[in-house]
Amino acid sequence: MNTVLDIVLHAPDAEGLQRARMNAVNALRAAPQTQVRIIANAAAVEAALNTPHPQADALTYLCPNSLNALGRTATAPLQVLGEPAVLALARLQKHGWAYIRS
């Protein structure tokens, strides 16, 4: 099956971020043409900042509200969403991305 998939992995906490990272790496290994985004909010934002992941950080988008609440800034390759995570998740789903809560 050669269908290109767009997958958004939602990580709301540290454990979810760990699962999302593993799922992203596994999905891309099995189907390199897949588009994968990890959207981290709440406790997952702090986990992403504190625990770098060379394979998944470039795919990881942080909620600006969670980042501001922590009083921290993100460094590349981590990216910051241009809107709250809840809106980004809804927008991606509206555009056909498959949502998976990690």
Short names for language-model regions:
Residues M1-S102:
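Secreted/extracellular ectodomain signature
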